[in-house]
């Protein structure tokens, strides 16, 4: 009977260790910056891994009051590019911890 308890304690320690490692990885990911770009860097959007926008740069030559739609499209492209990069990095970084776990 004690043998089973020791095994359970060992598993719990492993789970706690994995949780700490995962929290560390998440924290590092949250601090990392991701830059999304649209068409020759006419618009760039910088986010942190927790999806907080830190910067948005729009080149002057793309600002045309007669074509606001194009500028809006470029901003959307840059933001989406950054978010895709964050998602891929998140999966690569945290996926090893959640692989095979239901609901993750």
UniProtKB/Swiss-Prot annotation:
It is found in: Cytoplasm, Nucleoid. One of its GO terms (cellular component) is cytosol. InterPro entries: YbaB-like_sf, YbaB/EbfC. Keywords: Cytoplasm, DNA-binding. Belongs to the YbaB/EbfC family. Homodimer. This is Nucleoid-associated protein EF_2780. It comes from Enterococcus faecalis (strain ATCC 700802 / V583).
